[in-house]
């Protein structure tokens, strides 16, 4: 996963891009980078680490008054320093730098940007315009999905432009905001909100439609539909990936997670067992994505919600670690408990998912150690049976062996494999879809249903006129 941003502005574009890049840091912590373009130059700087380590100080030495276009990314992919995004490509006439959030299947050890960027540049070198080059690349990669930002420099015309593209399925989010003179693009709406609260003028804001391209240069703004949309928005964006203050496809992430918590209470008739007011029951979240779910559960039950597990924000995601022992140690280091919150109480934990079960068991075991009477685990997502397209196919999933069982049976079987947890309760796929509030056919729920929207059909093309390389 990756957070991407793009800015077209004649007023300190680099600083504005950097501010927005901080706002998508949660989408990737392995590396960061930025590309600035203007006049007849393009410069990229990148490195391993967080945005604050890589970009905060270095960018000042790259600033140039002609820089109208800046893109940036915070990447979660572990790659060699040389191959970190954004990646630059060059022909006799064009320079092109891109960063994308998504996945290209069968790419081997190459970055997503290497596959997409090389195809686009190959077409630019052949005299194809940028819009047709991107459309043809999307056609050649029918099962890929990506939200892309790019800086394009035409050396002959001494003109730079910002390009933003979202694939036909819209699996990953991409948001834009603009005024008469500026265009801002980001993976999520939250950094745009922050920018506006700091005094940035915004006249229009919206999701970039699936299958669409947006361009901004000194010649103005262009919006184009490249292929017909075939909506398949990743349901896990609302459950885990997205910031709670972001709005995706018109649905606020925090509100969706609250509804998921309320659905758990209704589905499993939890009021009879835990309904308040009771002083011996407390609902605590696994930070951060469990917090909004915790609010929904506590409100529905009428019991206290509190903080009982504290996360070390400087340790990365533990579920991506393959070695079980290293994963357990990392989880123990990442989470600590607040004794006063849980001692002598029945603890209800809210979490977005149980992937392997390592974190769940580690946290529950520590809660019991410090005095919790029992630990029940409420999972806002449905049981995960299939690894995402971007995950290794042999990834261990706690619920995978129990596909076909009822929700109650799956909860019992998973709880049996986690000795410190008394009960595990999941939402159903239907609950997840209802909480998001989009039609089922507009969501990708492959990991919980096995329905793969990316291989049903190829997106129909839009007829386009390609009269010059500038098109």
Language-model segments: residues:
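Conserved short alpha-helical segments that host acidic/polar catalytic motifs at enzyme active sites
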Residues: 1-208, 215-281, 286
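Flexible loop/turn segments at secondary-structure boundaries
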Residues: 14, 78, 106, 171-172, ...
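Generic beta-strand/beta-sheet core signal
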Residues: 99, 151, 165, 177, ...
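A conserved beta-strand->alpha-helix junction
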Residues: 114-119, 304-316, 417-436
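Secondary-structure transition/capping motifs at alpha-helix termini
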Residues: 126, 270-279, 300-306, 340-343, ...
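PRPP-dependent phosphoribosyltransferase catalytic core
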Residues: 159, 173, 205, 227, ...
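Phosphate/diphosphate-binding loops
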Residues: 200-203, 211, 262, 266-268, ...
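Short, glycine/charge-rich flexible loops or terminal/linker lids adjacent to PRPP-binding catalytic cores
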Residues: 299-347, 357-361, 385-395
